[in-house]
A protein has these predicted regions:
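Active-site mouth loops of central-metabolism enzymes
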Residues: 24-48, 108-124, 149-150, 179, ...
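N-terminal binding-site loop/beta-alpha segment at the start of enzyme catalytic domains
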Residues: 1-93
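A short, structured active-site edge motif that brings together acidic residues
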Residues: 90-103
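Conserved, mostly hydrophobic/aromatic
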Residues: 6, 18, 57, 65, ...
Length: 289
C-alpha cells in the first residue's frame, strides 16, 4: 500500500487507515453493526475479532490506526495488539482523541453512550489514560469533535496544554463533525501558540453524501496540515445496507459504476475519497475480515 507523510509532521502513514470506533464497543451507529459482531458482545470475543481485523489490516499494508478515549475498549485492544505483535513504534503511526468519555458500560441500549467535555482536566486525565492503554504507541493526539460552539478552540488553558504536549514531541490534531465543520477547521488553522501553528493535522467527515468540508480541507492542506478523512462510507449509508427509499436511485448509480469498473461499491466509495487531492489518509471502519 502507498505510504506518504502526514502533512508536515514527518509521520509516515498509509493511504488507508483503520479506525477503532466500531471495534472497541458493542453499540455503534454503523448500519448492521450488531450483525457484523454476530451479536456476540463478550469482551474477550470482541478483542479477538478486533485482532483479526487488525492483523488483516496490517498484512494489507495499513500503517495508520485511529482510536479515541470514547471508543470503549478500542485503545486497549489496539495497544495490546501492537505489543503482542511486537510492532516497532517506527513502523506505525497511531492517533487517538480526547474530549469524550465512554459511559455506556458495555450496553447496547444505554441512555447515553458518551459524554462530551473539552476541559483542561479532561485533557490531562485522558492523555494519561491514552498513553497507558496504548502502551506508549501514540503519535497524534486530537481534540475529539471540536465545534465553534464548544469553546475548546478559545480555551487558552487547553490550547497551552496541547502546546506543551507538542513541545514534548506529540503531534496535535483536531477532528470535526456536523454542518459547521468548515468554520471549525478554518478557526483551527489560525490558532498560533508562541509563534507556531498549534494543529498539525485535521480529521473531518468527507464522503459522497457530505462533501461540503472539501474547500476547508484544501485550505488546511495548503497550510501544511495533514488531512485524515473519516466516515468515508457514511457509517454504511453509502452501501447496499442503506434501505432508505430515497437512497435507491443513488445506490443504482453506485452499483452501475462499480460493475463497469469491476469493483465493489465499498471500494468505489473509498476510491472517491482517496482521489481527493487534500486526503492523506482515508479511514476504514471495518469490523470483520
Amino acid at each position: 500500500m502507498e505510504l506518504r507523510t502526514l502533512g508536515s509532521t514527518g509521520l509516515v502513514v498509509s493511504r488507508l487507515g483503520l479506525g477503532m470506533a466500531a471495534l472497541g464497543r458493542p453499540g455503534y451507529i454503523n448500519l448492521e453493526h450488531a450483525d457484523d459482531l454476530a451479536r456476540n458482545y463478550d469482551k474477550a470475543e470482541m478483542e479477538g475479532k478486533a485482532y483479526d481485523v487488525l492483523n488483516a489490516a496490517w498484512d494489507a499494508g495499513i500503517r495508520y490506526f485511529d482510536a479515541a478515549r470514547s471508543y470503549g475498549l478500542g485503545e486497549k485492544f489496539l495497544g495490546n495488539w501492537l505489543s503482542l505483535r511486537a510492532v516497532s513504534p517506527e513502523s506505525v503511526t497511531v492517533g487517538s482523541k480526547w474530549g469524550y468519555t465512554y459511559t455506556a458500560d458495555w450496553k447496547i441500549q444505554a441512555q447515553a453512550h458518551e459524554i462530551k467535555e473539552h476541559s483542561l482536566a479532561t485533557l490531562q486525565r485522558q492523555w494519561r489514560e491514552s498513553v497507558g492503554l496504548l502502551n506508549g504507541y501514540l503519535d497524534l493526539y486530537q481534540i475529539h469533535s471540536a465545534t465553534t460552539e464548544s469553546g475548546v478552540l478559545e480555551n487558552r488553558e487547553v490550547l497551552r496544554e496541547l502546546a506543551r504536549l507538542k513541545s514534548e514531541g506529540i503531534h496535535i490534531g483536531v477532528t470535526s463533525s456536523g454542518p459547521e465543520q468548515g468554520a471549525t477547521l478554518r478557526k483551527a488553522i489560525e490558532i498560533v501558540i508562541d509563534g507556531s501553528r498549534l494543529f498539525d493535522a485535521v480529521q473531518a467527515t468527507w464522503n459522497l453524501l457530505e462533501p461540503s468540508v472539501g474547500p476547508a480541507l484544501t485550505e488546511a492542506r495548503a497550510a501544511g496540515m495533514g488531512i485524515i478523512v473519516k466516515e468515508a462510507l457514511a457509517n454504511g449509508r453509502l452501501t447496499n445496507r442503506n434501505k432508505e427509499p430515497g437512497f435507491g436511485p443513488k445506490l443504482a448509480v453506485l452499483q452501475t459504476e462499480a460493475q463497469e469498473l469491476g469493483t465493489s461499491i465499498d471500494a468505489l466509495v473509498l476510491a472517491a475519497c482517496l482521489s481527493q487531492p487534500f486526503a492523506d489518509v482515508v479511514l476504514s471502519g471495518a469490523t470483520k475480515v
